Design a protein with these regions (language model features):
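Single conserved hydrophobic/aromatic residue that forms the stacking wall/gate
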Residues: 1-12
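Conserved beta-sheet core of the metallophosphoesterase superfamily
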Residues: 13-71
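A short C-terminal boundary segment appended to hydrolase-like catalytic domains
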Residues: 65-152
Length: 152
């Protein structure tokens, strides 16, 4: 099911290209419950368009490890009034972690940079994803989001 997949179907890439060609400068996809790639594509008129296919869940009480990793984008947009152009001049992805205790209690969100192995070892999602750890989250992030968009 592509809605839960970190991979992208051609339909999403084609739709992003259409939106870019129709004039979008930034495209943010939603719904898959997991993070998906971030990239620049070129619109028909030559503009560079930022595409964020999915930021995943910001906060949820779902029961699978990959759905605990979400993200926020920090985007700088620059407008040149003389040339009448607008462009994304900086785009950085910050990982977030939805954390909950056993029985889906005490749900909260952390920046991935502030998350620890100790927290991960107590996460309620370990009942369905025993391998869940800080390394698991960092590996997932680096597998999906290219270094160009990662902070640090």
């Amino acid at each position: 099911d592509l809605r839960m997949s970190r991979g992208l179907g051609d339909v999403y890439k084609r739709q992003a290209q259409k939106l870019a060609d129709w004039g979008a400068d930034i495209i943010i996809g939603t719904h898959p419950h997991v993070i998906q790639p971030v990239e620049y594509i070129t619109a028909a008129d030559g503009r560079k368009v930022l595409v964020i296919y999915s930021l995943g869940n910001f906060i949820s009480a779902q029961d699978r490890g990959p759905r605990m990793l979400g993200g926020m984008m920090h985007i700088t947009v620059t407008k040149d009034y003389r040339k009448n152009t607008t462009e994304v001049t900086k785009a950085k992805f910050t990982g977030t972690v939805t954390h909950y205790d056993s029985g889906f209690s005490n749900v909260r969100v952390y920046n991935l940079a502030d998350y620890t192995d100790a927290l991960a070892s107590r996460h309620g999602v370990r009942s369905t994803t025993p391998s869940f750890s800080l390394n698991y989250l960092n590996s997932l992030l680096h597998d999906v989001v290219s270094e160009e968009f990662l902070e640090g």
